[in-house]
């Protein structure tokens, strides 16, 4: 029971070790007297890497290994010379400086640890589905939650964050640092128009930024290892201060919070955000926090900028009414099942049901699937893009008719193989009787793509509306609004239905988009509910 192991760092702790600058990893008072005796820690004790300068400067290779073992460590990591280290320890054992009990103590602890993890009955790791086993969705969700709760708003003048009134904002993005900020920019663009701006000359950059009323700066540094440089260059500091002096700036640092130590004054920055890492997740979440799709709750883990911002500091911002982005499993859905949508979309394009598709799935305020397929037209000159804008139409079919049908199918009230003649007996004697619900919804019902109903309301000579069909005022006889100050007579819906009933079916059974089934489905749903 209890903690299985600890690692002792190469720290200088004068209150526990009297020798000047002596590393804790070689200190018997710290490891044996305090950790093992006073605190009664019985787990494995690891050294930090013995090739690090924090310890290697205190002795020669091999001798360091001996000192580490004598101090009370069980496992010595990254010895500079394993062979010499073993020789030193063995000589000390044979000379009596290391007792049998001391050696056996560590050996038994190591053997017990191996037994605990099953190495006494070793079985190779099963590599089948290894990537899926290691890339668990619950781990992704946990990492996202940790990052979201860590990201810290250090400064937020005039409640700049979250960014509101987007119609009044003209926003530029300036990238700094030596690592990529592509994910950050891509996520920012999901909320509004963002213009990336760059120039090799500071004066040129300042001129370009004059047309914008908000500048988002992303400082991106590699975090592939902890030893990568994380600071601003002198040039970047000059540019940063000049941009902030002439523009409203939101600075985002995707690096250690200590990066901000180099900034002498924050007076010209509207907001400052620390993202801690330059990972994909950190960039995505930071962008969402800027626009209020997610709240900011993070606090600084260290004091920075000469304690101007202390440990525990951090402004909290509210979530506003905007969609966030995340994993399907975070809202109770499956990414594996959603991946099947790719096949459906690709099939529709390959079969020329449509030249292109943009598909988005959102649940509980979170977008969990968003992909583009194909092109704008069959000529394939322009690919579908996330930045495309669409005319929104035909919403009644998907917002009213389809959900009601889905509910009826789900509870077993209707079946996708039910025929129109059975759903609506009045169509039993028509050529539409045997059309199934599945065929109607998938546009394989052999119905005409459309029927120009409006033509029967126009004068055949003048091509103008016939007065008996329309009125400028709404009434019981004319209740259907067509346009401003134009209302259609109520009984014209009977004409529409009769035209559909009388229409011929297409000879070939293949995909043909048609609105006509939804006239039937409207009748059915109104009769059912």
Task: Please name every model-derived segment.
Residues 363, 378-514:
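Active-site-proximal loop and beta-strand segments within enzyme catalytic domains
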Residues 28, 37-38, 58-330, 334:
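Preference for extracellular/luminal or secreted protein segments
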Residues 329-364, 471, 476, 494, ...:
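Beta-lactamase-like hydrolase cores
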Residues 2-22, 49, 212-227:
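Short acidic, glycine-rich surface-loop motifs adjacent to enzyme active sites
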Residues 6-8, 43-50, 76-77, 110, ...:
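Hydrophobic faces of well-ordered beta-strands that scaffold small-molecule active sites
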Residues 24-46:
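Alpha-helix-loop-beta-strand connector modules within alpha/beta enzyme cores
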Residues 368-377:
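Short beta->alpha transition motifs characteristic of CBS
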């Amino acid at each position: 029971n209890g903690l299985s192991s600890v690692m002792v760092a190469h720290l200088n702790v004068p209150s526990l070790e009297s020798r000047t600058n002596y590393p804790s990893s070689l200190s018997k008072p710290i490891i044996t007297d305090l950790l093992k005796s006073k605190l009664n820690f019985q787990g494995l004790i690891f050294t930090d890497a013995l090739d690090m300068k924090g310890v290697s400067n205190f002795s020669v290779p091999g001798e360091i290994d001996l000192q580490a073992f004598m101090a009370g460590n069980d496992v010595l990591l990254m010895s500079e010379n394993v062979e010499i280290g073993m020789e030193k320890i063995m000589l000390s054992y044979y000379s009596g400086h290391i007792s049998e009990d001391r050696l056996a103590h560590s050996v038994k602890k190591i053997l017990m640890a191996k037994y605990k993890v099953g190495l006494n009955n070793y079985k190779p790791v099963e590599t089948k589905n290894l990537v899926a086993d290691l890339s668990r969705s619950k781990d992704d969700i946990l990492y996202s939650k940790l990052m979201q709760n860590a990201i810290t708003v250090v400064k937020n003048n005039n409640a700049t964050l979250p960014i509101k009134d987007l119609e009044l904002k003209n926003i530029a993005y300036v990238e700094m640092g030596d690592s990529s900020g592509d994910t950050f920019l891509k996520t920012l663009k999901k909320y509004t128009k963002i213009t990336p701006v760059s120039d090799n000359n500071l004066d040129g950059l300042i001129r370009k930024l004059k047309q914008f009323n908000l500048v988002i700066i992303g400082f991106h540094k590699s975090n592939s290892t902890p030893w990568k440089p994380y600071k601003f260059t002198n040039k970047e500091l000059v540019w940063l201060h000049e941009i902030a002096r002439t523009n409203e700036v939101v600075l985002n640092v995707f690096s250690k919070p200590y990066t901000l130590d180099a900034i002498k004054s924050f007076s010209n920055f509207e907001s400052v955000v620390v993202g801690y890492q330059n990972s994909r997740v950190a960039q995505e979440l930071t962008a969402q926090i800027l626009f209020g799709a997610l709240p900011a709750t993070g606090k600084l883990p260290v004091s920075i900028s000469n304690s101007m911002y202390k440990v525990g500091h951090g402004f909290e911002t509210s979530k506003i009414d905007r969609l966030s982005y995340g994993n399907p499993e975070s809202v109770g859905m499956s990414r594996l099942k959603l991946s099947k949508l790719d096949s459906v979309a690709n099939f529709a394009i390959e079969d020329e049901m449509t030249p292109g598709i943009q598909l988005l799935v959102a649940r509980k305020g979170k977008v969990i699937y968003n992909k583009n397929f194909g092109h704008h037209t069959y000529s394939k000159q322009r690919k579908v893009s996330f930045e495309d804008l669409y005319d929104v139409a035909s919403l009644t079919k998907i917002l009213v008719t389809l959900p009601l049908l889905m509910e009826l199918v789900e509870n077993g009230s209707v079946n996708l193989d039910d025929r129109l003649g059975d759903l609506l007996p009045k169509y039993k004697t028509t050529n539409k009787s045997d059309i199934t619900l599945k065929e109607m919804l998938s546009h394989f019902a052999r119905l005409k793509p459309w029927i120009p109903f409006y033509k029967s309301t126009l004068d055949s000579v003048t091509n103008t509306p016939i007065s008996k069909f329309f009125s400028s005022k709404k009434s019981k006889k004319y209740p259907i609004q067509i346009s401003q100050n134009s209302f259609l007579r109520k009984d014209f819906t009977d004409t529409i239905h009769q035209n559909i009933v009388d229409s011929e079916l297409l000879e070939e059974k293949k995909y043909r988009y048609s609105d006509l089934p939804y006239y039937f489905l409207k009748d059915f749903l109104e009769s059912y509910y």
